[in-house]
């Protein structure tokens, strides 16, 4: 029986290096490393969005990556991509982040009743952004009701 000894070193994560790697060899980064790179950019910036879209391409079965990519798509008002990413989620539909993203999608599509259901579920779970989105939904509903009154009055 032969006994072999192998020594190896694990390289520490370097954010600046990871920012370069994601552009050329994203397959060399873990999903967590991609998340750290994304969060090093301003939320909603093109770089932030690009990293989340790269993550969902590299890890298409990871539902958190899909939810993050959907949120990034929603931030740039890309409803088609957001819906596609959210449709990739099967198991984690109870996550407040999923419900919030679906609520925002429904809000932007003008489906206020569905939006309210999703956003209330997310807010009930304690997601602060969902509460803010519910406030935005209330404003949209009020505006829509005012517009309808004006249109009906002018007939």
What is each residue range found by the language model?
Residues 1-155:
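N-terminal targeting segments with Sec-dependent signals, encompassing both cleavable signal peptides
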């Amino acid at each position: 029986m032969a006994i072999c000894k192998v020594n190896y070193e694990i390289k520490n994560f370097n954010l600046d290096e990871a920012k370069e790697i994601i552009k050329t060899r994203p397959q060399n980064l873990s999903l967590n490393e991609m998340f750290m790179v994304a969060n090093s950019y301003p939320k909603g910036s093109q770089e932030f969005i690009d990293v989340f879209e790269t993550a969902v391409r590299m890890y298409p079965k990871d539902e958190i990556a899909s939810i993050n990519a959907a949120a990034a798509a929603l931030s740039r008002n890309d409803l088609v991509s957001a819906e596609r990413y959210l449709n990739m989620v099967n198991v984690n539909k109870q996550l407040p982040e999923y419900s919030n993203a679906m609520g925002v999608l429904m809000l932007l599509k003008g489906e206020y009743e569905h939006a309210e259901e999703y956003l209330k579920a997310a807010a009930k779970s304690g997601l602060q952004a969902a509460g803010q989105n519910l406030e935005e939904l209330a404003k949209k509903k009020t505006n829509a009701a005012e517009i309808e009154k004006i249109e009906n009055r002018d007939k």
